[in-house]
Structures are given as structure tokens and as C-alpha cells.
Amino acid sequence: MKPEESECLCIGVLPARWNSSRYPGKPLAKIHGKSLIQRTYENASQSSLLDKIVVATDDQHIIDHVTDFGGYAVMTSPTCSNGTERTGEVARKYFPKAEIIVNIQGDEPCLNSEVVDALVQKLRSSPEAELVTPVALTTDREEILTEKKVKCVFDSEGRALYFSRSPIPFILKKATPVYLHIGVYAFKREALFRYLQHSSTPLSDAEDLEQLRFLEHGGKIHVCIVDAKSPSVDYPEDIAKVEQYITCLSNAYF
């Protein structure tokens, strides 16, 4: 452990798995000349509240690549079943004083760092919050109907009730707001390690959504509504969509 690691109080962890069932080798996929993981890392590094960014992986190719572009990566156990378990291993081994641990999914190359900061601020300002995650309003029918996009419903106090790949809520008669979940989780340390002690759950397995494991064991997830909605990479065909998004952003500034 490096001395500066032990002193970090707020860290960002980017889980990056090589053998993704949907897209093997995804972290190194090129997007306009830069890898997916490099773009995600560089965007996260713009956060004003994270003391350290670290890639958590199970593959030496990713370690070498992150080191080559000047990032920081560590090897985690191949037995980790999801990104949150990988995040927890990093926090336990390398950052014993970290009070807030942000799990930033490695497939969010266009994530605005202001989203990360908003989660950290909400976690710090709300004593009852133990896990905060962002959602964004959508009116796009394709996004609402596809199983690739996770939807979230929450109560009047901003506490998540459920996450699903199905369209929720069901729209019966009139237009109802639909919120998409963005794959970032800001944990208080105690909540993260409590999650790691929980066994897998039926709904989490059925939907293939790790956050449901936290809900099913009685945990409370607070949502943070954000304006920033950007494309993620789940399948090879998503690369072209992300490249188009980046091109449109570039054209808007020049």
C-alpha cells in the first residue's frame, strides 16, 4: 500500500472485467482512438471531490493499459461476481480510511464528473443516506422499452423502490415520468461492507442488477436526479452511438 492511499477519504473505483459475457475485452475497445476505460477514467478524474481514482480489474492486459496512459490500476480476485464486490475489495485492501467509495461503472465513457460530485455531496449532507445513485428523466420510447436500459421508480423522499429492465412504471392512461438509472453508486463505507456480506438474491439474479441485492436485504438506496444522460457501452454496437455522441458534443463547442 502506498502512503497516500491510506489517507484517501473519498475514492472512485472503476471495475473493469475482461471476460464480459456480453462484450469480452470491452474495457480496451477503442472510441475515437481512446479506450473505453481511459475515457471513463479521464472523465472521473475531473471530479473535484474524489481523492483518488483506481481501476479494479481481473486482467493484466487492463493493468498494463491503464499504467501506459498514466492511470492507476490494481488486480482484484477472479472470484468477485460483480463490480461492487470488486470495489469493496479495493476499499478494504488499499483504502482503510476511505469514508465514501464511489463505484463508477467502467462502461460510462461520457459520464460527467459533476454527476459523481453530486452523489458525494448528497451522501455527505444526508445523515440517513448510505447509498446514492443517479437517475435521469427520459421520454425516449426506445430507451423505455429496451432491456438494455435500467429504469427506476422511487418514493416522494427520493428512496428507490425498484430497478428493472422492464418499463416501470407501467403507463396505463396518461404520460408518466420514466427515469433511467445511471451506473454509478456512492457508498458510505459501512453500507458497502454490509452489502458484501449479503448473499445473492432472487430479484437481483432475475434482473441481473446488483443494486437489487442491496434493496432485497433491506438497504435504502437514495436517488439523485441529474440532467446529464449519456450513452453507455454494453454491446459492441454501442461504440458507434458513443462516437456519434462525442462528435456531436465536439461540434457544439466549435
Curated annotation (Swiss-Prot):
What's the EC number here? 2.7.7.38
Where in the cell does this protein reside?
Answer: Cytoplasm
Kindly state which reaction or reactions the protein catalyses.
3-deoxy-alpha-D-manno-oct-2-ulosonate + CTP = CMP-3-deoxy-beta-D-manno-octulosonate + diphosphate
Q: In which pathway does it act?
A: Nucleotide-sugar biosynthesis; CMP-3-deoxy-D-manno-octulosonate biosynthesis; CMP-3-deoxy-D-manno-octulosonate from 3-deoxy-D-manno-octulosonate and CTP: step 1/1; Bacterial outer membrane biogenesis; lipopolysaccharide biosynthesis
- Disulfide bond annotation, renumbered to this chain: none
GO annotation, cellular component aspect: cytosol
Its Gene Ontology molecular function terms? 3-deoxy-manno-octulosonate cytidylyltransferase activity
Q: Which domain of life is it from?
A: Bacteria
Q: Keyword Nucleotidyltransferase: yes or no?
A: yes
Keyword field: Cytoplasm, Lipopolysaccharide biosynthesis, Nucleotidyltransferase, Transferase
**One Pfam family linked to the record:** CTP_transf_3
Q: Which GO terms describe its biological process?
A: CMP-keto-3-deoxy-D-manno-octulosonic acid biosynthetic process; lipopolysaccharide biosynthetic process
CDD domains found in the cross-reference section: CMP-KDO-Synthetase (cd02517)
In the record, the note on similarity to other proteins reads:
Belongs to the KdsB family.
Q: What does this protein do?
A: Activates KDO (a required 8-carbon sugar) for incorporation into bacterial lipopolysaccharide in Gram-negative bacteria.
What PANTHER family is this protein classified in? 3-DEOXY-MANNO-OCTULOSONATE CYTIDYLYLTRANSFERASE, 3-DEOXY-MANNO-OCTULOSONATE CYTIDYLYLTRANSFERASE, MITOCHONDRIAL
| Protein name as annotated | 3-deoxy-manno-octulosonate cytidylyltransferase
Species annotation = Chlamydia pneumoniae
